[in-house]
Structures are given as C-alpha cells and as structure tokens.
UniProtKB/Swiss-Prot annotation:
Localization (cell): Cytoplasm
Catalytic activity: 2-deoxy-D-ribose 5-phosphate = D-glyceraldehyde 3-phosphate + acetaldehyde
Pfam families named in the record: DeoC
Family: Belongs to the DeoC/FbaB aldolase family. DeoC type 1 subfamily.
Native organism: Shouchella clausii (strain KSM-K16)
Official protein name in the record: Deoxyribose-phosphate aldolase
Keywords: Cytoplasm, Lyase, Schiff base
Pathway listed: Carbohydrate degradation; 2-deoxy-D-ribose 1-phosphate degradation; D-glyceraldehyde 3-phosphate and acetaldehyde from 2-deoxy-alpha-D-ribose 1-phosphate: step 2/2
Length: 224
C-alpha cells in the first residue's frame, strides 16, 4: 500500500534556499520509498540525475517558467531543452496566467506547445494552471488548451501562490481533460487522507514536499 502511494508522489523541494545536502537527501528518500520522481529547481537537475542514474523508477522532474509563468514561450522552450540536456525526464511548466485572463487563448496555446514540442519524446510535460488565481471558466479553458497542445498532465498549483490543490478543482480538471491526460494535485497535501481524497477525485500524480510523512503515516509540515 505504501509503495502504491509512493509511486503517485513527486517528492518535491523547490525552496530557493534548498541546499545541496537537502537535494541529496531528497534523492536518497526518493530511492528508499520509490517515489515517482524528485521535483527540483533547474539548477539541481544535473546533480539529481547523477544521483538517480542507477534507479530506473525515480524520474527527475523540474519546473519551467516557475513560479509566475510570465517568461516568453521562447524562454520556456530553452529552459526545457536545457533541463533535458542536464537529465530531466519530466517538466512542470507554468502557463501564462495573464494571457489566459486576457482571453489570449492562442498565446496560451503557443506557450504550452513551445514546451511540449521542446520536450517531445524526451520528457513528460505537466501544465501548471495555478488554480487559486483562476475562475472555473478559466480553469476549464486552460485544461482544454493544455490537451490541445499535447500536454501529458495538467497540474493545479505551484505551491507558491495563494492556495493549493482542492478536491473540487481536481474533479473539474479530470472532467475537462478526460481519461487520457494525467491530473497532478499539488500544494498543501500533507497526509494520506488528503492524497486519497485527491486520487478519488481524479488525480493520478501528487506533488508534495511531505512525501516521507505521507507514506509513513506522519503529518508533514507546510512548505514546498
């Protein structure tokens, strides 16, 4: 059971003050518990890839255009290619939230597609919506655009804004993307009950900094 739960979790450490020692510990924990991935800032990708090169079950996930999503599609594409060159096999990109709110759907589509194309056949792409900043209509539109762009997953949150994952948002996202696209719940998930609620609502991946606490039955602290 704990292993099944662990395989859903992106073991996450995205704080600006994370140290090399902490990243190495994150990788060690990911190997011990067999988490789906470690999710880290781009600076640490090369180190994590080196640490995990003998482990075929733990992916190296990083973030693109993070946490605001306000860099250009060209910049996001470069970040993606650079991360993959350094060993990333999954990328979580933040959409252009302003463009979505301005109803510039073609811009949002191009932005997501720039990352999807840069990652094609080399890394999974997860699209972060930052749901706490969006209306339900905007969430639906963002999900539809992510599917149209060819993304592998849609994801709720960066963990750095005003809110995290909710069961309601996961259910909405699952309804819009259908069965063939993954849904990642992230932000504020700190215990097994929260994981189970998200999975029941339709999540197929969980982003959490409290992965060890979740699989061992403790309660994790806040923070991403």
């Amino acid at each position: 059971m704990a292993t099944d739960i662990a395989r859903l979790i992106d073991h996450t450490l995205l704080k600006a003050d994370a140290t090399k020692e902490q990243i190495l510990q994150l990788c060690k924990e990911a190997q011990t518990y067999q988490f789906a991935s470690v999710c880290i800032n781009p600076y640490w990708v090369k180190l994590a890839a080196e640490q995990l090169k003998e482990d075929k079950h733990v992916a190296v996930c990083t973030v693109i255009g993070f946490p605001l999503g306000q860099s250009t599609p060209e910049t996001k594409a470069f970040e993606t290619k650079n991360a993959i060159a350094n060993g990333a096999t999954e990328v979580d990109m933040v959409i252009n939230i302003a463009a979505l709110k301005d109803k510039q759907d073609q811009m949002v589509l191009n932005d997501i597609r720039a990352v999807v194309d840069a990652a094609k056949d080399k890394a999974l792409t997860k699209v972060i919506l930052e749901t706490c900043l969006l209306t339900n209509e905007e969430k639906e539109r963002a999900c539809a655009l992510a599917v149209q762009a060819g993304a592998d997953y849609v994801k709720t949150s960066t963990g750095f804004s005003t809110g995290g994952a909710t069961v309601e948002d996961i259910a909405l996202m699952r309804r819009v993307v259908g069965a063939d696209v993954g849904v990642k719940a992230s932000g504020g998930i700190r215990d097994l009950a929260a994981v189970n609620a998200m999975v029941e609502a339709g999540a197929t991946r969980i982003g959490a900094s409290a992965g060890v606490a979740i699989v061992t039955g403790a309660t994790g602290s806040s923070g991403y």
